[in-house]
């Protein structure tokens, strides 16, 4: 029998539903790794839209309805949180830190991996490494390798994960990457575009609350602000934060730079002041970042050479909603403009909205800070003193 012409062979493969393996040059393009030097690109909140696994632990893949991942950069560490929702609305979460030793390193090691199920946290013993691959701005491709097997995980940034047609169109590219990495394509997980997550509702409900303030509109955050409600997690200053009495923030915007001053008064009337300058981060992330700051306590100034990321959310004219991730932990901070911060009934009525925003952002609501409406600040009183009338 003579050789089958190439075009006939391709037609036969198409009829049989068989795909030709990706060419080496195509694999080279798809598998370009993200190094430590460029790891800022993985920061953010991500929704798993496609995955395939070669693993003995099938329970991790079976009955999965959604998986939501948060990557927070803290200096040389990537804080990793993965929340998996299964059929029946049961949740399993994983927590770890990722690290790489050199700027050119392409693999990140998992440290202190923990698993949480039904409120019980326990160590999850798996010596794993992670590799990220270059992809589109709102996409994340990640390969996990550990004792339990290998996983290829394809994500879309939270907020751009619901267009089912776009996700379907991208599946062919995901499958090519899997084949390039040597995965067996059997029954991939495919997100349906609508399922909720463990810690929050899908963005139909949260979209209104989490609209970010962009660089173009940053002037709206300028002013003097009083903290009226806040929640934190993974805080390195949790003891001090529990003793917080008031927090007063001054923000001034000049040529795209936010000059930030925070004055915190503790319950023993001692004060801590933090100052830094923030600039806009990557356009697609709508964040503002700083790389250093100064902390003053009892007249002693300490220079902090640490990274922090801030995101502001659209809200009312005299309101400020701010999410902070960095050296001090992860905080949601709700402010009222100085002068409209004292109406306790109004503040109480707004607490439900603050809690909804916290849940949308993945915070556990435990013991929030709530301003009492009257306590003074480090540098001034909460209310101007009323002078007695002259006879």
Curated annotation (Swiss-Prot):
GO terms for molecular function: toxin transmembrane transporter activity. Binds both saxitoxin and tetradotoxin. May play a role in toxin accumulation and/or excretion. Glycans are attached at residues 54, 63, 97, 234, 268, 277, 307. InterPro entries: Calycin (IPR012674). One of its GO terms (cellular component) is cytoplasm. The gene is psbp1. PANTHER family: ALPHA-1-ACID GLYCOPROTEIN (PTHR11967), ALPHA-1-ACID GLYCOPROTEIN 1 (PTHR11967:SF2). It comes from the Eukaryota. Homodimer or heterodimer of PSTBP1 and PSTBP2. It is found in: Secreted. This is Saxitoxin and tetrodotoxin-binding protein 1. Sequence repeats lie at residues 24-202, 203-391. Glycosylated. Keywords: Glycoprotein, Repeat, Secreted, Signal. It comes from Takifugu pardalis (Panther puffer). GO terms for biological process: response to toxic substance.
